[in-house]
UniProtKB/Swiss-Prot annotation:
Additional comment: Belongs to the LCE cluster present on 1q21.
Tissue-specificity statement: Skin-specific. Expression was readily detected in adult trunk skin, adult arm skin, fetal skin, penal skin, vulva, esophagus and tongue. Not expressed in the cervix, rectum, lung, colon, or placenta.
Record protein name field: Late cornified envelope protein 2D
Family: Belongs to the LCE family.
Pfam family of the protein (one): LCE
Keywords, alphabetical: Keratinization
Membrane-traversing stretches: none
Upregulation: By calcium and UVB.
GO-annotated biological processes: keratinization
Alphabetized InterPro entries for the sequence: LCE (IPR028205)
Function statement: Precursors of the cornified envelope of the stratum corneum.
Length: 110
């Protein structure tokens, strides 16, 4: 009986908080690269000129290099896929008047 009582007294009190291990997992994930490469430049217009060949607009997401003024549409609608021509359905050529193809918010070209 006295031996068991001595063992209970030698045990640490339960109210003491356990110590943190020295190899604790980090709270924050590894740092990201300082700057991720942006796909589009905010200063670039949404229209492609014949000289530029290809550019990226804020709404279009990019322009096609074929034709010099082609512009990728911002929206892909399955119902318009039946209007395919020799060109890919998400590109439009420059207008005959000389204006470059522009992407409007609706996804059309001027």
């Amino acid at each position: 009986m006295s031996c068991q009582q001595n063992q209970q007294q030698c045990q640490p009190p339960p109210k003491c908080p356990p110590k943190c291990t020295p190899k604790c997992p980090p709270k924050c994930p590894p740092k990201c690269p300082p700057q991720c490469p942006a796909p589009c430049s905010p200063a670039v217009s949404s229209c492609c000129g014949p000289s530029s060949g290809s550019c990226c607009g804020p709404s279009s997401g990019g322009c096609c290099s074929s034709g010099g003024g082609g512009c990728c549409l911002s929206h892909h609608r399955p119902r318009l896929f039946h209007r395919r021509r020799h060109q890919s359905p998400d590109c439009c050529e420059s207008e005959p008047s000389g204006a470059s193809g522009c992407c409007h918010s609706s996804g059309g070209c001027c």
